[in-house]
UniProtKB/Swiss-Prot annotation:
It comes from the Bacteria. It comes from Escherichia coli (strain K12). The keyword Signal applies. Residues 1-32 form the signal peptide. This is Glucans biosynthesis protein D. Coiled coil: none annotated. GO terms for biological process: beta-glucan biosynthetic process; glucan biosynthetic process. Pfam families: MdoG (PF04349).
Amino acid sequence: MDRRRFIKGSMAMAAVCGTSGIASLFSQAAFAADSDIADGQTQRFDFSILQSMAHDLAQTAWRGAPRPLPDTLATMTPQAYNSIQYDAEKSLWHNVENRQLDAQFFHMGMGFRRRVRMFSVDPATHLAREIHFRPELFKYNDAGVDTKQLEGQSDLGFAGFRVFKAPELARRDVVSFLGASYFRAVDDTYQYGLSARGLAIDTYTDSKEEFPDFTAFWFDTVKPGATTFTVYALLDSASITGAYKFTIHCEKSQVIMDVENHLYARKDIKQLGIAPMTSMFSCGTNERRMCDTIHPQIHDSDRLSMWRGNGEWICRPLNNPQKLQFNAYTDNNPKGFGLLQLDRDFSHYQDIMGWYNKRPSLWVEPRNKWGKGTIGLMEIPTTGETLDNIVCFWQPEKAVKAGDEFAFQYRLYWSAQPPVHCPLARVMATRTGMGGFSEGWAPGEHYPEKWARRFAVDFVGGDLKAAAPKGIEPVITLSSGEAKQIEILYIEPIDGYRIQFDWYPTSDSTDPVDMRMYLRCQGDAISETWLYQYFPPAPDKRQYVDDRVMS
């Protein structure tokens, strides 16, 4: 699974559209755009032109691998790359009066080898000019870059861009597009976490995963005082092309992105992932196997939340399995889904480097009918926190054939909490541990005689307190094994209820156990549905080893 190695560092990218490829699809004009750093010829541009461009590009062969970078950039270390700074005095919207937003570009180099072209657009006239690379746009500091190798390299391009918001202009960015089709945003903590992608291809198939690239961006000049901007993107890959429109609202406590894409398949595609997101889960309250550090929990996200088309809410805690797992949850016109980080308590992480308690959640809200399909969740084994091991996306049911065209509209919310939540009782936390004894009576002189695994799921909110006098009933379904010693406990500190049960194996199978539970009262559901996947140990490991030394 070397496919993930670049995500936290130098992210690999796929195709790049050459200069002649894009330029030949533009009509020329004679208007001077108002961006000081835009130095290319004027070109007619709007979203319909971009759609035509992507459509026509899909009729041509993919251009394949990028050309080599100058040696001084190709051999850079991460430390050297990070020391390169864009000159804030030459930012994209530096001359906009009363600007609340500004944009800067990332330098090529290190693992960022596919050039991305940048254009400034006058939204009133629909005329664009390209922003060409030149060394004077950057401050190289002690990066050790031989700038003589960069002279005359106006077509070198950029690696990506980031956007800043007042009062932190040029200091703390709120949106970043960098590497392949990856992008991310922050909430009011300014702490980056999980990432989104433009598209995912063959994430879990017998084919090698394909990583499409955003190869060009067009920025509408931002209006004075505005906190919303629009950027368009051309996506290119061996199997597909796409035209994207991002309307990005940089609000006080969150970033909201309205996304519209038009996709054009070059080839048959086994697995097409829409609105994909990538995160990290090493260990948490439910999964302690890889938590032999000083940190109680290590994760960017703690759960997959789904609001199904039929109205059902589902909470699926994330895992760090010993073996790669892929699960697909069927749906029809989903109302929303996302990877959430709902535990915001610093004491639960004790991390002053990663600040996982500040990392945003990401919620996807479809804005048109997506039809039948599945929400795919892939969980990759990881030994630490430097590998993004969680992938989630929507996969349409319809097979993708060469020549097919698709259009999707959706909204992305980057925030501490999703914009909507289940009106019924919600899962607050999931915990697992040794079972086989009565709660509060873990034996001190010997281990339980029979091996079992305990699960404790905390529910809060909804009408739990009103339902309690009438009787709360946990409805538990298991794909294998038995649930015993089921208890319902009121937890005063959270003003909620803990449903606790022990899982006992009924066979020697080590296949994953799919667990499902919800609460009901007098026949009516009063909670969201909890889904979980447990990986039982081998039969010879289903015993407690007493390694105490008593003398």
